[in-house]
From Swiss-Prot:
It comes from the Bacteria. IF-3 binds to the 30S ribosomal subunit and shifts the equilibrium between 70S ribosomes and their 50S and 30S subunits in favor of the free subunits, thus enhancing the availability of 30S subunits on which protein synthesis initiation begins. The keyword Cytoplasm applies. GO terms for biological process: ribosome disassembly. Monomer. InterPro entries: T_IF-3_C_sf, T_IF-3_N_sf, Translation_initiation_fac3_CS, Translation_initiation_fac_3, Translation_initiation_fac_3_C, Translation_initiation_fac_3_N. One of its GO terms (cellular component) is membrane. This is Translation initiation factor IF-3. One of its GO terms (molecular function) is translation initiation factor activity. It comes from Synechococcus sp. (strain CC9902). The lineage of its organism: Bacteria, Bacillati, Cyanobacteriota, Cyanophyceae, Synechococcales.
């Protein structure tokens, strides 16, 4: 019987970037850190210039003849590229509607679990459908279900705002939450804003009569 093939569980080797001493081309077209052209120079000269500037020599176009390099801060460049990739991924995220289900008699532990689920969905940029399920005669307790949903909205108010208030839908009561776009202004912040607004109100002009001194006897 032929031996079974073994899978290589080692982590894949990442391709190292072509920078500095890893660049092997003898002649390079070099762009300086400010965008100016240094022209076609030798690899050694390009490395010397990058060292003088305390920057990196980065290969940006290997297929050009001769290959094109740019002098830059590679660490900063890599950070900005990763940041742009994350922002692009965030923008491409398709908003979904996630559902959190519960009964109106939910205990505190299960309630905390549902709050945690909703927080994760909201953090991912998704809307949350909060559903209270009624069984049998439980449909008589819609008022308690609405209280529960309002409580959930209050507990999530720092991350979410109500898109649709609690309402009956068949044998369920539902409420929709959407990720909060503007930060919630807390009471202390509101008071501070009010006091600041009061301080910026100009004082009323003094009356002319008050400025005229009373005649001396």
């Amino acid at each position: 019987m032929a031996p079974r093939p073994r899978f290589d569980r080692r982590a894949p080797v990442r391709e190292l970037p072509n920078i500095n001493d890893r660049i092997s081309y003898p002649q390079l077209r070099v762009v300086d850190s400010d965008g100016s052209q240094l022209g076609v120079i030798s690899r050694e000269e390009a490395l010397e210039v990058s060292k003088e500037r305390e920057l990196d020599l980065v290969l940006v176009s290997e297929k050009a003849d001769p290959p094109v390099c740019r002098i830059m801060d590679y660490g900063k460049f890599k950070f900005e590229q990763e940041k742009k990739a994350k922002e692009a991924k965030k923008k491409s995220h398709q908003t979904e509607v996630k559902e959190v289900k519960m009964r109106y008699k939910i205990d505190s532990h299960d309630y905390d679990v549902r709050i945690g689920q909703a927080q994760r969905f909201l953090k991912a940029g998704d809307k949350v459908k909060c559903t209270v399920i009624f069984r049998g005669r439980e449909i008589q307790h819609t008022a308690l279900a609405e209280v529960l949903l309002r409580r959930m909205a209050k507990d999530l108010e720092e991350k979410a705002e109500i898109q649709q208030s609690p309402k009956r839908e068949g044998r369920n009561m539902i409420m929709f939450l959407t990720p909060r776009k503007t930060p919630l202004l807390k009471k202390d912040d509101k008071d501070s804003s009010v006091h600041q607004a009061i301080r910026t109100i100009p004082a009323p002009p003094r009356s002319t009569a008050a400025k005229v001194a009373a005649p001396q006897a």
